[in-house]
């Protein structure tokens, strides 16, 4: 480990979540000498999310049985009045995984193409001389100074690394979704391959989820700016009449909590010799709070651009901005549209949520916001005040 931390690297990636591991993987396969640093003593812990991941083929990741717990075909949206909307396409939409194993799988995949990995290593400072960064690392009480031509910050919602580099990424409290979740056994699912989502006063400005996970299920929720704690809402939901007793015999085997930055992406994700990816960059769905897909994709882009920059011997912001251009071209409009839709949905009363559900077909292949908004206003004109900028 000492030799690892005493070396100099082309690229240092900080944070071994999905975004960081994908960035280091693509940096390494593009020829850059890469170090992946994580503060945890075990990659993949603690788990802080509902563990749903997208269809993985586009990332070249084999859906290994070691981490796949359930295949997901779609979702069931449940309105406050109990009406269910089934959203189901024609193929597998993704998976619920064991994140502890999934994250390790991604890190091992990166190591197999040359990435070096340092665990139990906390970054406590950054120094920049105009050409390279010196990353100051505390590993088991020992301080190391490691040089890198490029630093990629993938250190999650609580990111401090980007701030050290002068990039503003601190999130407002009102932009952080507080999440609490039980993994439970003996849950009676509506469908073993469908995710369930519940809306209304049971979870203000958020939603409750039940995700099938093999022999267990993840039951959790995310709330924003609430007077009560997420865990209090979750415990109340476990006895909610909408569940019709489906959790009466369920019991928790694990508790997880965390936060998701749902206020949209940060304004700037690059600087000279520096990039930001994943939750640290706000690359997360403002509506669902899901960020694994975006982290995998944006991490891949960052790693590729880092490798190209090293080959070109140009690590300036003018070169690295290609990362920002590529990810924004793919996702920026989508994220900003979702932010707009989220602000609309958060204003809905339970009565209005029921009216919206009544305006939707009971079976959908996908969510078309404009079409749903048009039908909702047609059936319930009072909703026009919310949807006038959408239809």
From Swiss-Prot:
Stretches assigned to coiled coil: none
Cofactors that this protein relies on: FAD
Residues binding FAD: 19, 38, 49-50, 52, 99, 123, 279, 291-292
Catalytic activity: a 2,3-bis-O-phytanyl-sn-glycerol 1-phospholipid + 8 A = a 2,3-bis-O-(geranylgeranyl)-sn-glycerol 1-phospholipid + 8 AH2; 2,3-bis-O-(phytanyl)-sn-glycerol 1-phosphate + 8 A = 2,3-bis-O-(geranylgeranyl)-sn-glycerol 1-phosphate + 8 AH2; CDP-2,3-bis-O-(geranylgeranyl)-sn-glycerol + 8 AH2 = CDP-2,3-bis-O-(phytanyl)-sn-glycerol + 8 A; archaetidylserine + 8 AH2 = 2,3-bis-O-phytanyl-sn-glycero-3-phospho-L-serine + 8 A
Record-linked SUPFAM superfamilies: FAD/NAD(P)-binding domain
GO cellular component: membrane
InterPro entries assigned: DGGGPL_reductase, FAD-bd, FAD/NAD-bd_sf, Geranylgeranyl_Rdtase_fam, Geranylgeranyl_reductase, GGR_cat
Cofactor note: Binds 1 FAD per subunit.
Alphabetized GO MF terms: FAD binding; geranylgeranyl reductase activity; oxidoreductase activity, acting on the CH-CH group of donors, NAD or NADP as acceptor
Residues holding a 2,3-bis-O-(geranylgeranyl)-sn-glycerol 1-phospholipid: 369
This protein's pathway: Membrane lipid metabolism; glycerophospholipid metabolism
Record's keyword terms, sorted: FAD, Flavoprotein, Lipid biosynthesis, Lipid metabolism, Oxidoreductase, Phospholipid biosynthesis, Phospholipid metabolism
Enzyme class: oxidoreductase
Keyword Flavoprotein: yes
Cited Gene3D superfamilies: D-Amino Acid Oxidase, subunit A, domain 2, FAD/NAD(P)-binding domain
E.C. number: 1.3.-.-
Family in the record: Belongs to the geranylgeranyl reductase family. DGGGPL reductase subfamily.
Role according to the record: Is involved in the reduction of 2,3-digeranylgeranylglycerophospholipids (unsaturated archaeols) into 2,3-diphytanylglycerophospholipids (saturated archaeols) in the biosynthesis of archaeal membrane lipids. Catalyzes the formation of archaetidic acid (2,3-di-O-phytanyl-sn-glyceryl phosphate) from 2,3-di-O-geranylgeranylglyceryl phosphate (DGGGP) via the hydrogenation of each double bond of the isoprenoid chains.
Any further remark recorded for this protein: Reduction reaction proceeds via syn addition of hydrogen for double bonds.
Protein name per Swiss-Prot or TrEMBL: Digeranylgeranylglycerophospholipid reductase
